[in-house]
Amino acid sequence: RQGVTIAPLQGISEVKIKKNKDGTDYLSVSIAGPMRSAGGTESAVTLLIADHVRKIAGLSKFQANSFDDETGRFVEELRIYEREASSFQFHILDEDIEHVISNLPVELAGVDTDPYEVVNHKGMTRIQTDRVRGGALRVLNDGLIGRSKKLLKRIEMYNLDGWEWLGDLKGAVQTGDNQEDAAAKRMREVITGRSVLSMPNKLGGFRLRYGRACNTGFAA
């Protein structure tokens, strides 16, 4: 098994019980940062676990506030982070962001991680910062949406209900028209000093694998 570079449980900074507009209680999970995008499926599973805990505790589902436009806040925040702070593993559509925030049974919150503020969605009632929340955005972008198809398999395996709406997402969007475009984009994002051994999906390309496995002789 290949290594996972996110520790989702350590990435949780706080768990709260908060109030919906109708007075019902819901569960809010605050994600810390910074976090890397590798292991996005595992980071998204954190919210599946949180939803299971919510059901056991008898809490209501999270209801996104329309009067505060919490869905619009996530769209603006993610695009600012993408433009000013750091890139994501996948590019996703605005409509997918809105669909996820509108249907999440638990609140995806987070601490601010970068000195960039939203412009149109400041001073919101249930969001305590105007700055971008990198950890929460990575769970949303590269976990819930970018790996929605893999997540649906986990949901089926765990026999969970209430997450069927993930099947309506378009998921990760391929931005390159051909392999040359995709390769050029990856090369632009390579950190100076890092060697490039092979491009993804290259037939016969060199790839490092970490961890214990019989075929490497490190199975003890």
PLM regions with names:
Residues 1-220:
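Extended, Lys/Arg-rich, non-catalytic nucleic-acid recognition/anchoring regions
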